[in-house]
Each structure stands twice: as C-alpha cells, then as structure tokens.
C-alpha cells in the first residue's frame, strides 16, 4: 500500500465534495427557514448546486466500490489485507449515509412545502418592491411570476428525469456491448470446436485405415514366418536322412 494508491486520490476528492455539499446544505436550510435573507434565484442556484454535488459524490463512491471489488478479486496482486479493505468499505458506507440523509431532507414533503412557500414569499417580495400602476396589473404580474416558478420547477424535474434516462441508456449500451462481446466469443469458440471435431473425425478415419493396413501386414508376416518354419523342418529331415544313410553304409562296409 503506497501513497500513489488511486483510492486515496479519489477519497480526498470525495471528502472535499462532501464538505462543499454540507456547506451548501446548511445554506439551503437557512434560506428555507428565513424567507427574508435571499431571493428565489439564490434558492434555485443553491438547490441545483447541492443536487449536482450530491450526484457527483454518488458517482465517485460507485467508482470506489469498483476499485474495492477489483482488489477483492485479486488480493495478492494489490497486497491489501482485510483490515484495510474494511476501513475503505466503512468510509464508503458512512459517506453514502451522509449523502442519503441530505437527499432525504431535500425530498422530504415538509421541506418541499417550505421551499415552495419560500419561492412564493420571494416572488411577493420582488413584486412588492416594484411599482405597478393598478391592482389588476399587479396580481396578473404576480400570477405570471408564479406560473414561471412552477414552469421552472417542472423543467428541473424533467431535466432530472432526462438525466436518469441518459444514465439508463448508457448502462444499457454497456450491457449491450458486453452481450455482443460474449456473443462473438461464443461464436468463435463454437467455430473452433467444429474445426476440432472435423480434425478428430479425420484423425479417426486415418487411424482406422492405418490399423487395417497394420493387420494386413501382420497377417503377411505370419504367413511368411509359417512358410519359413516349414522349410526348416524339411531341411532338418533331409539332413538327418542323409546322415542315417551314411551311417548304414559305413556299418555295412565295416
């Protein structure tokens, strides 16, 4: 384990991002609790910045999870013990809990109602600071501002949904690419197996042919051996007969 470990680089960035997000969250809470200290633009900016920071932290935590999975798959290569892995997992879990708590607070119904009330109060404050010539024009202007605020909220929700859809599309593309790679690998393996099957079939035919030829050769050798044995027997009989005749002749002569 060294200081060049990429985990610590990403960990430092995550800690900085968490500190920034906590500061934004504190400011966001203050803006909602005290309607007189900020405008609607500041509330919107703080809300968007906070959400973007939390989303970025979640992505970084996913990257850290992947690094831990890689290390667990091959612990000898990275030379990390179980204690160090436990510390890293604990950091990811605690950080993810902090992010989840802030997101839960932002999505809480009471906090959303407080945010909407703050937006309305900011609109009323901005509207009251302007000089309008008549009462009906004042309320129509306020109504337009409220509609604009609602439109802004709807656009923000649509943007979030679009971001989710894009992330899902990216994940589907990754899955599709992996499936394509596996399909190509399976096709190659299938082709190689077919080629090997053909080679084995050809080898089997050649082996059968060789075995048949070997049997024929062995039969011919057996015949030749048998013939040679018969010739030797006849030669031995003739030699013995000649010796017997010689002995008889010598006996008669002597």
Swiss-Prot record:
- InterPro entries (alphabetical): SNARE (IPR010989), Syntaxin-6/10/61_N (IPR015260), Syntaxin/epimorphin_CS (IPR006012), T_SNARE_dom (IPR000727)
Gene Ontology cellular-component annotations: cytosol; early endosome; endomembrane system; Golgi membrane; nucleoplasm; perinuclear region of cytoplasm; phagocytic vesicle; recycling endosome membrane
Coiled coil spans: 46-72
Keyword Nuclease tagged: no
What residue ranges are annotated as transmembrane?
234-254
Instruction: Give the GO terms filed under biological process for this record.
Output: endocytic recycling; endosome organization; Golgi vesicle transport; intracellular protein transport; regulation of protein localization; retrograde transport, endosome to Golgi; vesicle docking; vesicle fusion
Q: Which keywords belong to this entry?
A: Coiled coil, Endosome, Golgi apparatus, Membrane, Protein transport, Transmembrane, Transmembrane helix, Transport
A Pfam family this chain is assigned to: SNARE
Q: Which residues lie on this side of the membrane: Cytoplasmic?
A: 1-233
- Name any one GO molecular function: SNARE binding
| Disordered as annotated region, ranges | 103-138
Where mainly located?
A: Golgi
Q: What topology does the record note for this protein and the membrane?
A: Single-pass type IV membrane protein
- Entry function: SNARE promoting movement of transport vesicles to target membranes. Targets endosomes to the trans-Golgi network, and may therefore function in retrograde trafficking. Together with SNARE STX12, promotes movement of vesicles from endosomes to the cell membrane, and may therefore function in the endocytic recycling pathway.
| Descriptive protein name | Syntaxin-6
Q: Which organism is it from?
A: Gallus gallus
């Amino acid at each position: 384990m060294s200081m060049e470990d990429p985990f610590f680089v990403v960990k430092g960035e995550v800690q900085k991002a968490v500190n920034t997000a906590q500061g934004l969250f504190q400011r966001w809470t203050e803006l909602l609790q005290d309607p007189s200290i900020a405008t609607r633009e500041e509330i919107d900016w703080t809300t968007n910045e906070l959400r973007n920071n939390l989303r970025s932290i979640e992505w970084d935590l996913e990257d850290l999870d992947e690094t831990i999975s890689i290390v667990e798959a091959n612990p000898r290569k990275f030379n990390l013990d179980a204690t160090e892995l436990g510390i890293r997992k604990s950091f990811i879990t605690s950080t993810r809990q902090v992010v989840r708590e802030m997101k839960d607070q932002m999505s809480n119904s009471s906090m959303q109602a407080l945010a909407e009330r703050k937006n309305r109060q900011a609109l009323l404050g901005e509207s009251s600071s302007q000089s309008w010539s008549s009462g009906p024009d004042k309320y129509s202007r306020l109504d337009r501002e409220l509609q604009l605020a609602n439109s802004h909220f709807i656009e923000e929700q649509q943007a979030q949904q679009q971001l989710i859809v894009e992330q899902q599309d990216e994940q589907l593309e990754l899955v599709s690419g992996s499936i394509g790679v596996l399909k190509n690998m399976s096709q190659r393996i299938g082709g190689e197996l077919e080629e090997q099957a053909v080679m084995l079939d050809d080898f089997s035919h050649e082996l059968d042919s060789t075995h048949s030829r070997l049997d024929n050769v062995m039969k011919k050798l057996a015949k030749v051996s048998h013939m040679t044995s018969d010739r030797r027997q006849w030669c031995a009989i003739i030699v013995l007969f000649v010796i017997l005749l010689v002995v008889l002749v010598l006996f008669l002569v002597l």
